[in-house]
Amino acid sequence: MQHGRSFIGICVLLLAAACQSRDPAEPRAGPRIALVLKTPNNPFFIDMQRGAEEAARRLGVRLVVQSPEREIDVEKQMQIVENLVQTRVAALCIAPASSKGIVPALAKANAARIPIVVVDDEVDAAAAADAGVSTDSYVGSDNVEGGRLAGRHLVMASGGRAKVAVLEGIPGHETGDSRLRGFHEAIEVAPGVEVVSSQTANWERDQGFTVFQNMLQAHPEIDSVFACNDMMALGAVEAIAAAGRTGKIRVIGFDAVDDARKAIEAGSMDASIAQFPSEMGRLAVETAVRLVRGEKVPKDQRTKIGLVTRASR
């Protein structure tokens, strides 16, 4: 009998401990806000989720975070959105895996009268108009200006003479396309800066390594790289190291994730364009909550950017 009482006592203690382990800031009730990311594996989106979670705790709402495993899995992201619409979330925050491909899923959110906050990658305006899709607000960086910052830095750092390889994002992504547009605008002023190869590496580090390795073999004269995100840039850094050319090829990335900042400090990357994904996540959730409350919100909300170099750290 004594053993039975001891067992019951232990169970009670474990149950109490389990109850206490619950995050005290997590609301037991309140509107459910969905945040759909492109991937859980990119530090950029990890930071975005962190900012969103902080805002959700502070505002007393329940945050549901979901994403496909890979950024290129547009179909999976569409399925996630459709499922969230079925469960009647109060609002949807989404970083689209495809600016055009996500439009049919957003149409279902519109039909269910679920407010939509787009984060990071803008929805293609023409595709949305053709489908009769509307969104309530956009939260993100000025990617064209970020591309210009990268291009201006390359022109200055190279003295106006460079053989450049460009690692693009997924074709059709507004984010990557905007960064490329800004970059090309900036380097046009320097006729000595020549893009000798430009290919997609689909935002991924492994592909950044493979694609740039092939570029370097085809164009050994390459002395500079602009990658539309840091994951691809870090892949290029690894390919440069494998070729024994560390320190001889300048690499400029975009996002200023921790690994990129470490590479800049070590001298294996030259620069990166800093975004503030935590701020994006925070502002997206705050905007979604305002929409749920029936408040008016700005249609376009831009977060800050900046150039990170070894000198600026």
Question: What is each model feature region?
Answer:
Residues V74-A90, F209-E221:
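Short, well-structured alpha-helical segments in soluble
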Residues R32-G51, A55, L59, V64-E82, ...:
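Extracytoplasmic "Venus flytrap"
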Residues K100, P104-E145, M156, K163, ...:
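Flexible loop/hinge segments that line or gate small-molecule binding clefts
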Residues F44-R58, G146-A150, E174-V193, Q207, ...:
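Short, solvent-exposed amphipathic alpha-helices that sit
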Residues R28, I33, Q77, S137-V164, ...:
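Hydrophobic alpha-helical segments within soluble ligand-binding/sensing domains
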Residues Q20, A29, L167, P171, ...:
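Hinge/cleft segment of the Venus flytrap/periplasmic-binding protein
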Residues P96-A111, F183, V196-S197, A201-K262:
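Hydrophobic alpha-helical
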Residues L15-A18:
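C-terminal motif of bacterial Sec signal peptides marking the signal peptidase cleavage site
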